[in-house]
Amino acid sequence: MYCPKKGSFIMKKHAISLRSSTVILMRGLPGSGKSTWLRNNNCEDYVISPDTFQLMLSPPIETTRDGEFTYEINQNVSRRAWELTHECLRSRLSCKVGNAVGATFIDATFMSDRAVRDIKRIVLEETQGRAIVVILDFTYLPIEEVKRRNKMRRGTYRYVPECVIDHMVELGAQMDVNSYGVRVLDPREVQITV
């Protein structure tokens, strides 16, 4: 990254190659900047997103929350969206046609133990240890900032009720991300390479 004030390049502490056999879990609350980080780092072609599958399976649903009309992602298709996420991950990890290689980013909150363990299990089953799992942890962002950003989404299907965010915070606080045996990185210290 170029630093104009100093006229030099700043080296990030960690590099992730888009050609590596790496599965990167984008962990963080809704509105913490996961999708923006992926877009800003030109990683969108390497992303699997359960939210995208939910929108493919069902249009947003109309609802009234706190007396206000709004749209939400249909949570009734969440299970199927995660099944498709797992199927796509298995396909990417097992694809040998044309000597395919490449990183895979999974854009979800990963604020539950099960979601992380499921992905880790799939990676191990499909690659027998040839691929690694990394967590890019966006939980450094203060909850007040997450809620401020979320309020800016009000009226769109990307808005998440604050009670849901609070519940995710509680779930995430129970997790010890260092117990999964994977690298946990601060996204501000990661550089993407080709």
Please place each PLM-identified region on the residue numbering.
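ATP-dependent NMP and nucleoside kinases share a basic, alpha-helical "lid"
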Residues: 56-61, 65, 110-158
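Structural signal for conserved beta-strand scaffold positions within catalytic alpha/beta enzyme cores
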Residues: 49, 135-137, 184-186
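ATP-binding Walker
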Residues: 32
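Conserved substrate/cofactor phosphate-moiety recognition/catalytic segment
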Residues: 36-102, 145-147
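Conserved GTP-binding G-domain of TRAFAC-class P-loop NTPases and closely related GTPase folds
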Residues: 7-10, 14-15, 20-23, 27, ...
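Short catalytic-loop micro-motif centered on adjacent basic/acidic residues
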Residues: 103-107
